[in-house]
UniProtKB/Swiss-Prot annotation:
PANTHER family assigned: UDP-N-ACETYLMURAMOYLALANINE--D-GLUTAMATE LIGASE (PTHR43692:SF1)
Major site of localization recorded for this protein: cytoplasm
E.C. no: 6.3.2.9
Family statement: Belongs to the MurCDEF family.
InterPro entries with a match to the protein in the record: Mur-like_cat_sf, Mur_ligase_C, Mur_ligase_C_dom_sf, Mur_ligase_cen, MurD
Name the UniProt record assigns to this protein: UDP-N-acetylmuramoylalanine--D-glutamate ligase
Positions annotated to bind ATP: 118-124
Pfam families referenced in this protein's UniProt entry, alphabetically: Mur_ligase_C (PF02875), Mur_ligase_M (PF08245), MurD-like_N (PF21799)
Gene this chain is encoded by: murD
Keyword Glycoprotein listed: no
Top EC category: ligase
Amino acid sequence: MLNYTGLENKDVLVVGLAKSGYEAAKLLIKLGANVTVNDGKDLSQDPHAKDLEALGVKIVDGGHPLSLLDNEPIIVKNPGIPYTVSIIQEAYQRHLKILTEVELSYLISEAPIIAITGTNGKTTTSSLIGDMFKKSRLTGRLSGNIGYVASKVAQETSPNEYLITELSSFQLLGVEQYRPHIAIITNIYSAHLDYHETLENYQNAKKQIYKNQTENDYLICNYHQRHLIESENLKAKTLYFSTQQEVDGIYIKDGFIVYQGIRIINIDDLVLPGEHNLENILAAVLASILAGVPIKAIIDSLTTFSGIDHRLQYIGTNRTNKYYNDSKATNTLATQFALNSFKQPIVWLCGGLDRGNDFDELIPYMKNVRVMVVFGQTQEKFAKLGNSQGKLVVKATDIEDAVKKVQDVVEPNDVVLLSPACASWDQYKTFEERGERFIESFRAHLPSY
């Protein structure tokens, strides 16, 4: 951790506890600050609040009294606290310094940063970069919106390691000095307008990621959204990714991922499915190359990376059949997305809690479905759907039985996909439990194990 003295003996008000507020408060104590934590909820039984009180932190809960601003503290804002909260608005009116927890992580670390933001794909891209580092001899530590508090991870990261930080628009809003060496914008679409009010405000929040970059830094973005990048404010070297054409950066040509004219890998050898994931993969490969990850480690990652748990997660191959766990698909929209991700014939495992809906909206996405293995309360509805489309329908009692029956109908090169399009509660407590049962059954029933 950098020996940062800018907060020593300063009054600091942390607004919002949760995980990031808790870690920020502990860090601020280490940095010699006089710390108060304020949260609108009752924290009288909160173990984190009790821990902080034992360290000398003052806790003010149950509201946001404006009197907390009377001693003109520096504000550290939890990303979950909107800027519209009265105490933050008043702090702006009084021209008080407001830091975000991510900004704090930057101030106390000399580690180079790969920062990833975007409306979609940022978690997959961040995780894939982390896996590429793991496959090499380099160290990259995941942090930020992906679930590891940035200010905590930053303390553990040395200058010769990378911080790989996923950033939401909420975290980027408060950027002042934050400067990643490599910044990625996966894409920008309309989202979180309840928070940002306008699309322009949301886009501007995302653009904060390159606000402080210099000509020694890199910005990686989607070539087909390059019009969203403001060139007049951009100093970093801009590189692009595209699945459709050659660009200055990384692209797909003749079925290969290509960087600077060099073929890296055939896309048929990737285990992460879907056109959307091709863009995530390109961004991750380019960032990892720029950070010095060897091509061999990148290829190793691309041929083994299973994705995010229960979200089109690759769980293994038996003979020529790849198996994917998409248990998080608890509605038809998510399953449409999954069915559209494969060009190969699909053995589709589906069914679950009956909420009274039919599934006809899935019909346009079923062209590659060869077999349906149906279970749960919606078994008969899915059987009727499959029969109406001329699919082979097999009935199973549960996930375990479904995996067993797959063995009787699967053909070479079929993809086996669990994407239930239903909640799990008829048979399993959570979609995670359902997905784990699928993985366990795959391992238990298949001869390769």
